[in-house]
């Protein structure tokens, strides 16, 4: 009986160590976009804004990272493994597109690809010549300093029956699972938005007047609601960007082995 209980405890501790992880370490390969025009046509629908995020250090990711658009805006630290050409720090990239290839987990912008190189003359150009490289990568929080998350009202929006928004500068290390929407007031009647594609959310039940949002994210293993009051004024306009008044800082736990622990150094 004692041995049986000991076995249960060992299994529990092992399972906990595997499942509870802030940052999972992944090993795969990465390529880069040879055409700069591809960076502005990513599946996340950031358009030409994509190249302005993280100084153009952006990437396309496989479906398990893209998550039908929920992974748009996620940040990853990635480094290549060639000891002659690659730095140990690597670079941080933001996900802006879907990578449908089964040869690589990530396809980086050429700027991000070169940033993985050692800071020695010619290393970045030699790295580009490799085309596809072995990498390690881990998810990290997106840090925008003191900047709040923004809400962009897309051009397809039309009062009073259709609202299409895109989330920009989304911080933290988690995903927005759902968005609720309501008119600003003492007793709001909350509706919901649907993810259309990428970072774009839509609703055909548009509240009148000023609009507030509730963003549901994962903090640890649990859901958490972030309430953003009075984001869109009553005279909101398509094509404009509005300050959400809040920022996401939560970290979602991942289930994996190994965690980054002391491996990334």
UniProtKB/Swiss-Prot annotation:
Belongs to the expansin family. Expansin-like A subfamily. It comes from Arabidopsis thaliana (Mouse-ear cress). Its main location: membrane. It is a single-pass type I membrane protein. CDD domains: DPBB_EXLA_N. Residues 161-244 form the Expansin-like CBD domain. The keyword Transmembrane applies. One of its GO terms (cellular component) is plasmodesma. One of its GO terms (biological process) is anatomical structure morphogenesis. The chain crosses the membrane at residues 42-62. InterPro entries: Expan_Lol_pI, Expansin/allergen_DPBB_dom, Expansin_CBD, Expansin_CBD_sf, RlpA-like_DPBB, RlpA-like_sf. Residues 1-20 form the signal peptide. Glycans are attached at residues 99, 102. Coiled coil: none annotated. Residues 41-147 form the Expansin-like EG45 domain. This is Expansin-like A1. Keywords: Glycoprotein, Membrane, Signal, Transmembrane, Transmembrane helix. It is found in: Membrane. It comes from the Eukaryota.
């Amino acid at each position: 009986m004692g041995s049986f209980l000991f076995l249960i405890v060992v299994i529990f501790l092992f399972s906990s160590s595997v499942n509870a992880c802030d940052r999972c370490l992944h090993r795969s390969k990465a390529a880069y976009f040879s055409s700069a025009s591809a960076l502005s046509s990513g599946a996340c629908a950031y358009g030409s804004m994509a190249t302005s995020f993280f100084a153009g250090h952006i990437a396309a990711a496989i479906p398990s990272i893209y998550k039908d658009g929920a992974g748009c805006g996620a940040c990853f630290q990635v480094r290549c493994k060639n000891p002659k050409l690659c730095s140990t720090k690597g670079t941080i990239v933001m996900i802006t597109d879907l990578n449908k290839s089964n040869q690589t987990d990530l396809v980086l912008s050429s700027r991000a690809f070169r940033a993985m190189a050692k800071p020695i003359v010619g290393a970045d150009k030699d790295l580009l010549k490799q085309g596809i490289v072995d990498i390690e990568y881990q998810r990290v929080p997106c840090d925008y300093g003191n900047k709040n998350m923004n809400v962009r009202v897309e051009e397809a929006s039309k009062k009073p029956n259709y609202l299409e928004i895109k989330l920009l500068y989304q911080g933290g290390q988690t995903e927005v699972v759902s968005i609720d929407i309501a008119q600003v007031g003492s007793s709001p009647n909350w509706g919901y938005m649907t993810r259309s594609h990428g970072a774009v959310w839509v609703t055909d039940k548009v509240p009148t007047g000023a609009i507030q949002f509730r963003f549901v994210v994962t903090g640890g293993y649990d859901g958490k609601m972030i309430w953003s009051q009075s984001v869109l004024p009553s005279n909101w306009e398509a094509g404009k960007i509005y300050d959400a008044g809040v920022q996401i800082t939560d970290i979602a736990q991942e289930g994996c082995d190994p965690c980054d622990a002391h491996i990334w150094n």
